[in-house]
Amino acid sequence: MAFNFTAFTYIVALIGDAFLIFFAIFHVIAFDELKTDYKNPIDQCNSLNPLVLPEYLLHLFLNLLFLFCGEWYSLCLNIPLIAYHIWRYKNRPLMSGPGLYDPTTVLKTDTLSRNLREGWIKLAVYLISFFYYIYGMVYSLIST
């Protein structure tokens, strides 16, 4: 059982993906609170907007590690979500700071349901990725 760069990449990806899962869970909880009217949109957007860039950068960093170690299947598994993140950030509402969520439009029914659905889909993708990364780590440790 040898430790190599691929195993290190999968270990870092597991830790990073755990953070991404927590980001997605927070995203779902935050929009559910908005849907049930537990919090006002200004406070909720002020707590969600600072987490957008760290989530996107962490996901991009993990995939750069996969690119450097030549794990093409893991990279291809994440390319659609990277493309969606880039598209979503380029088409964000015009605001003074970084972030995606505008307090004036976040309570619209279609925007709220789209953001909630986005959170659930991201949570599913990150969970599937987490278990695949466990498999990849074990496989890379055993195969060498």
Curated annotation (Swiss-Prot):
Topology in the lipid bilayer: Multi-pass membrane protein
Lumenal side of membrane: 1-10, 78-122
GO BP term (any one): protein transport
Known function: Acts as a cargo receptor necessary for the transportation of gurken (grk) to a transitional endoplasmic reticulum (tER) site and promotes its incorporation into coat protein complex II (COPII) vesicles. Associated with gurken, produces a signal received by torpedo resulting in a signaling pathway that first establishes posterior follicle cell fates and normal localization of the anterior and posterior determinants, later they act in a signaling event inducing dorsal follicle cell fates and regulating the dorsal-ventral pattern of egg and embryo.
Keyword line: Developmental protein, Endoplasmic reticulum, ER-Golgi transport, Membrane, Protein transport, Receptor, Transmembrane, Transmembrane helix, Transport
SMART domains reported in the protein's UniProt record: Cornichon
Pfam family name, one: Cornichon
Transmembrane feature ranges: 11-31, 57-77, 123-143
The family this protein is said to belong to: Belongs to the cornichon family.
Cytoplasmic-side positions: 32-56, 144
Gene of this entry: cni
Region annotation (Interaction with grk) ranges: 1-57
Name by which UniProt lists this protein: Protein cornichon
InterPro entries given in the database record: Cornichon (IPR003377), Cornichon_conserved (IPR033466)
Gene Ontology cellular component terms for the protein in this record: endoplasmic reticulum membrane
Subunit (UniProt): Interacts with grk.
Naturally occurring in which organism (per UniProt): Drosophila virilis
Cellular localisation: Endoplasmic reticulum membrane
